[in-house]
Amino acid sequence: DGARAPWWRGGARAGFVGLGSAHDAGDLARAAVESVAADARRCLAAARELSGDRGLDGDGPADGLVMAGMGSTDPLWAEVLAGVTGEAVTTRRSAEAASAGAALLAASAIGWPVTLDDLNPFVAGTVPTPEVVERYRRWSANADRVAETLVDLDFGEGSDGGEGEAGSF
């Protein structure tokens, strides 16, 4: 319910802007993926600002993104994330990141010298092309303005997922 990072607005709602008669369900699905990627870009920018672009370990900026979980099995998701963030995206062999982590902990607990790369190696990388990054950069300027407006709209009583009709005026 609502918008999570980087917005943190519990009552926020989503919407599709700019739809035309030529758009179909596939366009809506891609727009949803692009929206999630845009929030990932916003979170990445906030993390870089807070860290002074030193990275989480203080040794310098992060070099690309790593996808884990079931979403990492979809090449389109990696392509969109790479294009929207402008970062290379790497995936691991198994989408079961939690299981690989549990196996790593178990192996470590009994003294086996195993690393995450042994259990679940990197297998694929998606490097964004300059053309795609530029297209998403232009798209992002509009998307950011729309998102900043949408998260602050007040849809009134019932827009919290309760009995009312969300978004009715």
Residue map of PLM features:
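Glycine/Thr-rich phosphate-binding loops that ligate phosphate moieties of nucleotide
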Residues: 1-169
